[in-house]
Amino acid sequence: NGYSHIPKMFFRPIKISRDDIGKRDTFTLDEYDEMVKFLRTYTAKKLCPDEEQRTERQKVRDYILTLSNTLMRTGELRQLTWADVLGYEDRVDMTGNKVCLVQLRIRKETSKVRRTRIIWVRGGEYIKRLKTYSSFTEPTDLLFTNRTGTHPLGTRELYRHWDVVMKGIGIEDHSERKLSFYSLRHFGITMRMKSGVPIADVASVAGTSVSHIETHYRHIDDDVMKETGLRNFAPVKEGEEAFG
């Protein structure tokens, strides 16, 4: 009947209230750029010759980059299987840069809001790259697995690497700032809002409500409107449009 049997599901208790996403600290754009640069070094063969350890680092790297690009919740991404990767499409964005979009299915069984959603998002290149070095790529396999492929990549392993990455980019107070993997979703939403993506579109991709975005990201929406408003103050010469 078109339904798939998922043989195993893994859920861990969480203590994140629905309001936390708007209150959590996130990264500045400079900090995020530093993290991307650090991850290149962190996964380099020269600095990590042990293949098994390097593979784990690569998974953590692509887990980080996928979270920030897809706006997924950590639990949703950890439950994503290769059968949920529905397709890719190479496009050129509004700035002229080539991007690889990926279509993903977040199943209701793994979603916090218990609704299936299918989204097109950036970050397809990271998922493609993951498939080149992962030993577990069957349709029912999880994208981000532990070393044996039997469970999701462990929380202990993830945060062991997270601590190294945060210190590596000079954020010693990441615990005090409450920077976690979940902050990457917050960062992704923030960047989409600052880029002027309509709230309804951001909410749809993130799997949350428009009212939730409006409530907890209203300050960002206000900033965007202010920036748009300021563009009216540029001198307008005859024959030119007010918005340059």
Predicted feature descriptions by range:
Residues 41-44, 51, 88-90, 95-98, ...:
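C-terminal secondary-structure termini that scaffold catalytic or DNA-interacting sites
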Residues 5-74, 78:
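Basic, Lys/Arg- and aromatic-enriched nucleic-acid-binding interface segment
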Residues 41-54, 70, 135-142, 150-151, ...:
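Short, basic (Lys/Arg/His-rich) helix/loop patches that form interaction surfaces
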Residues 11-13, 19, 31, 38-40, ...:
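Conserved tyrosine-mediated DNA breakage-rejoining catalytic core shared by Y-recombinases
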Residues 34-48, 61, 83-92, 145-146, ...:
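Short regulatory "switch" loops immediately downstream of catalytic or recognition motifs
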Residues 75, 156, 211:
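Key DNA-contact positions within bacterial/archaeal DNA-binding proteins
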Residues 21, 28, 110-131, 140-164, ...:
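C-terminal catalytic core of Y-nucleophile DNA break-rejoin enzymes
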Residues 26, 98-99, 108-112, 206-230:
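Catalytic-site neighborhood detector that most strongly recognizes the C-terminal catalytic loop/helix
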